[in-house]
Amino acid sequence: LISHTSTIVPFFFGMLTAYFVYDKYADKSTPFLSFALFIGIAMSITAFPVLARIIQEKGLTKTHLGTISLASAANGDITAWCLLAVVIAIAQAGSMLSAVYNILFSVLYIVFMFLAVRPFLRMIGHIYHNKEVIDKGLVAFIFLLLITSAYLTEILGLHALFGAFIAGVVMPGNVKFRKIMTEKVEDVSLALFLPLFFVSTGLRTEIGLLNKPELWWLCLIFIVVAIAGKFGGAMFSARFVGESWKDSLYIGALMNTRGLMELVVLTIGYEMGILTPSVFAVSYTHLRAHETAANLVC
């Protein structure tokens, strides 16, 4: 309940905010629904890796508060990924019927990955159950699977990012296998792709566009709406399920952590032409300010 409420409440707050800013700041060729959905999803995600790091540094990993916060963030991220997939399918479709087709094919693809690909990968996981090292051929195969899955979802009308995510989800549940593969993937992604992504995002962000007081006011509104939606949704739902007011306040603050995933959502919206350069700059600035404030509070 906490995870879904803390995702859905800021999502609708974001859509409501989009209603008031659409006429003035959105591209006239962009449908309102696509614009509102992207603003909503960008405000509704909790940065799970950032939250996990904060909980670890504060020594809350094995506490009741830390467990609830991490579980809520993990479930909320899954909800956000599903919402993002639907949002992209709707935004890329020319009509509602096309959006339904995109969503239907995407569901079929997910079913195929879980019913056909996952059992095959589980067999591989059993083979490497007690091994400390994975051979290069298997590593190459896993990378090929990630790329293929990303390419197929791009064809189906979703973003390539979603396909890579699904490929990661269907990996064998073997903890040792996942740990080794995570290290292999991170060797490439953290050292090469992530810095390039930040460079690309920095080049896209035109802070100079924020040259009017009204845009800075819009940035402040985004910050307030995002914090209020996330904090309120998490806090009141935590209180509803029986948590104390103190723990509910802590959960609301912890669920307000922001990070890379929000930036990915904004970048996708910008690449698809749904977010204008000025809205992207405002959203990026609000994200950085929100992330800094949340980390200081936590």
Predicted region positions:
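Membrane-interface junctions of multi-pass transporters
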Residues: L1, M123-I221
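Membrane-interface helix termini and inter-helical loops of multi-pass transporters
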Residues: Y22-S29, I90-A99, E206-E214
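Structural signature of hydrophobic alpha-helical transmembrane segments
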Residues: L33-S44, N102-V111, L156-A167, W217-A226
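Conserved small/polar residues in nucleotide/adenosyl-binding loops
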Residues: T285-T292
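The feature identifies polytopic integral membrane transport proteins across all domains of life
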Residues: L1-T5, A26-M43, R53-A74, I180, ...
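Transmembrane alpha-helical segments of multi-pass membrane transport proteins and ion-pumping complexes
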Residues: T7-M15, Y19, I45-P49, W81-A85, ...
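Hydrophobic alpha-helical transmembrane segments in multi-pass integral membrane proteins
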Residues: G14-A18, W81-V86, L146-L158, F197-L209, ...
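C-terminal ends of transmembrane helices
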Residues: P49-L60, P119-Y128, V170-E183, A234-G242
